[in-house]
Design a protein with these regions (language model features):
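Non-catalytic, alpha-helical, charged scaffold/linker segments
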Residues: 1-3
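Radical SAM [4Fe-4S] cluster-binding motif and immediate context
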Residues: 167-238
Length: 238
């Protein structure tokens, strides 16, 4: 049906070659796959219902990258007035030295690291008529005069973990999900089988010495634990 299909990692191989945009760009200019067709149909239904001014994609892993680009491409072609942003683990690690202007055929903003304040400023820019050269941004790539620019010009500080709020799952259709275990390893069932409400217990890593991890990044090296009281309050709110 679709050679790129995976339960949770669609077209992951393409996303893993982050040192070059060529293969992904060629794929995006190819015909829609079977999975593309029904994904974009659902996306169109939601866009027509909500009529947003800004659409944001969180891309944590390579297996989420293609779908984000394909969806952004669809929005650009059919809803040109909607602004589009991308953030998450993948750009945080793989797009820190972004230079390829073609990425901005799909996205208007790409943010790095903690997302609360960058997204707040992106939102303010997206709904205002302010010229992008006059706007404030936090760790955000934009395209200006056909050049990729990294802007970090706000004096505002990131939000502390105690003030980011409690996740809202009220519109998540949990009763319509199925449990899928991709491999036989029973350890994987601990975090992939059934429903889990996940909460952030700390920002960053208290250890910060693993050689396989990029501990130079702020969202890893800046350790900020959350108090037990706040965690319990958030559990009760959920």
């Amino acid at each position: 049906i679709d050679a790129d299909f995976g339960f949770s990692r669609y077209a992951e191989r393409i996303g893993q070659s982050a040192n070059s945009f060529e293969e992904l760009y060629e794929k995006l200019n190819d015909q829609h796959t079977f999975t593309d067709e029904f994904t974009l149909k659902i996306l169109q239904e939601k866009l027509d219902l909500v009529q947003p001014k800004l659409v944001c994609f969180s891309v944590p892993f390579p297996g989420n990258l293609y779908a984000a680009f394909r969806s952004a491409q669809f929005i650009k072609a059919n809803y040109p007035n909607i602004k589009i942003a991308m953030g998450g683990g993948f750009p945080n690690t793989e797009l820190r030295e972004l230079k390829d202007a073609r990425v901005f055929e799909f996205f208007d903003y790409i943010t790095l690291d903690d997302g609360e304040l960058p997204l707040e400023l992106v939102y303010e820019n997206a709904i205002s008529n302010k010229n992008i050269s006059e706007a404030e941004f936090k760790r955000t790539f934009i395209l200006e005069n056909k050049e990729v620019k990294y802007i970090n010009n706000t004096a505002r500080s990131d939000y502390k973990q105690a003030f980011v709020g409690t996740p809202d799952y009220s519109n998540l259709l949990l009763d319509q999900y199925i449990s899928v275990i991709e491999i036989a390893n029973p350890m994987h069932s601990l975090w992939s089988d059934g429903r889990w409400n996940k909460l952030t217990m700390a920002h960053g890593c208290y250890w910060g010495k693993c050689t396989f991890c990029d501990i130079s990044l702020d969202y890893i090296k800046i350790y900020e634990p959350i108090s037990a009281k706040i965690l319990v309050d958030r559990m009760e709110e959920l």
